[in-house]
Amino acid sequence: MKTVTVKIETLSHDGRGVGRLNGKAIFVEEAVPGDVAEIRITGRQPSYEEAKIVRLIDSSEDRVEAFCPHYETCGGCQLQHLSIDAQRKWKASHFYTALSKAVNMKACQIEAPLVGHDHAYRRRARLVLGKNKTDKEARFGFRAKGSNEIVDIEQCPLLTPALNEALNQKRTAVLPHASRALKEISVVDADNGIFWSDQAVDSSTWPSYGVNGLTLNFPAQGFVQVNAEMNEQMVNKALDWLDLNKEQRVLDLFCGVGNFTLPIAQQVKEVVGIEGETDLVQMAQHNASRAHCEQATFYQADLFKDVTPQNWFRKQKYDRVLLDPGRQGAYQLCKGLGQLKADKIVYVSCNASTLIRDVKELEKQGYQLKKAIMVDMFPHTSHTEVMAQLIKTGKKPKQRGPGIFKL
């Protein structure tokens, strides 16, 4: 198949290199801005094309050798070929550029990204056991790039040492039981041991983790941030942005087991945590009791439905609101947040696009974006965590403008 030469100019939202040929964008796998490469087209769409590198003619100064032997086949990482500094610069720039195109940033301060270690940071993983269709060999590892095949993994440089040790032990036990029916098995490196999803856990041995001097239990198969170091930084940034005191009432939406709620409780008069999953509410209540946090109260509610009739919402006044929804965001919920008349809102998200959408809605209710930051929760992947702080002004949104950048 014919090859063409292209210079890579930027990165797409998913970390692919982007060049242009005959006025059309070309998305090139594992390409870095500054690369000049001979490429082969692998897919054509009306407005863009997709390609793979055949040969590098000139390498970008930001290009590095991938450190994992499975990088070319494993679907876990997307950016190991890009230096860690360049990764973080791209993630921050991509977020701030998208934000500035959508909302008023004239009064917004862009804070320097929160960063930490980029190896051995993952305390949670989801693995797959099964036999591949092609060679019928039993494998235990991660899904391959762009397919349901399994990449057999003995060690992952992003996992904590304890997880890698547990992974090797688990392989011996499960590989003889592999079949064509793929089985997902998750594992977490908790502060009190290794917990596998296929092993029963009772209340006396719930997994736990620490944050801000507190110990929080969580369900063995439930959510916990994969990066303990960055979670601590993120919680402390939220506390700083909330600007708390002992006279305040705070509402924590999508509170989980109390990751933000209980650190907030240490600094305020009252904090109310709302979560959709009953088992997480019960776990949060347990964590509050264990920590003697009488200031914290938890309720179960479907936050994707109308919550205005709920007692914790109706005719209530909160000084601060924090929300940390999943990837789908909280658009419907944000439509009613103005009724609470909170002076400040801190929004935490693993999906920049839904955060931006919801910030636009909060602008309509008289809130102004004051601070934004990228949190590098997932180094060497195209994923990131982002945060925004808004204050109540009562004014309608003005025209968009650039923020105050501190990269």
UniProtKB/Swiss-Prot annotation:
[4Fe-4S] cluster binds at residues 68, 74, 77, 156. One of its GO terms (molecular function) is rRNA (uridine-C5-)-methyltransferase activity. Pfam families: TRAM, tRNA_U5-meth_tr. Residues 1-55 form the TRAM domain. It comes from the Bacteria. GO terms for biological process: rRNA base methylation. The keyword Coiled coil does not apply. Keywords: 4Fe-4S, Iron, Iron-sulfur, Metal-binding, Methyltransferase, rRNA processing, S-adenosyl-L-methionine, Transferase. It catalyses: uridine(1939) in 23S rRNA + S-adenosyl-L-methionine = 5-methyluridine(1939) in 23S rRNA + S-adenosyl-L-homocysteine + H(+). It is an enzyme of class 2 (transferase). S-adenosyl-L-methionine binds at residues 225, 254, 259, 275, 302, 324. Belongs to the class I-like SAM-binding methyltransferase superfamily. RNA M5U methyltransferase family. RlmD subfamily. This is 23S rRNA (uracil(1939)-C(5))-methyltransferase RlmD. It comes from Hydrogenovibrio crunogenus (strain DSM 25203 / XCL-2) (Thiomicrospira crunogena).
